[in-house]
């Protein structure tokens, strides 16, 4: 799991994805890696 996802950050989805190495998704407040 990566950093928490903040809905106020418009780049959050990309940051989550990058953190997971290209396979991340924001699910509620959590950044989940596949």
Swiss-Prot record:
Gene Ontology CC terms: extracellular region
Subcellular location: Secreted
SUPFAM superfamilies: Scorpion toxin-like (SSF57095)
Major location category of this protein: secreted
Molecular function in Gene Ontology: chloride channel regulator activity; peptidase inhibitor activity; toxin activity
Keywords per UniProt: Chloride channel impairing toxin, Disulfide bond, Ion channel impairing toxin, Knottin, Metalloenzyme inhibitor, Metalloprotease inhibitor, Protease inhibitor, Secreted, Toxin, Voltage-gated chloride channel impairing toxin
Tissue: Expressed by the venom gland.
Keyword Hydrolase: no
PROSITE patterns: SHORT_SCORPION_CHLORIDE (PS51200)
One Pfam family linked to the record: Toxin_5
Source species, domain of life: Eukaryota
Disulfide bonds, paired cysteine numbers: 2-19, 5-26, 16-31, 20-33
Function field: Toxin with unknown function in healthy organisms. Suppress growth and migration of glioma cells and decreases the mRNA expression of annexin A2 (ANXA2) and forkhead box protein M1 (FOXM1), two key molecules in the progression and invasion of glioma. May affect chloride channel. May interact with MMP2 and inhibit its catalytic activity. In vivo, is not toxic when administrated to mice at high doses.
Entry similarity comment: Belongs to the short scorpion toxin superfamily. Chloride channel inhibitor family.
Written domain comment of the UniProt record: The presence of a 'disulfide through disulfide knot' structurally defines this protein as a knottin.
Name assigned to this protein: Chlorotoxin-like peptide MeICT
Organism listed in the record: Mesobuthus eupeus
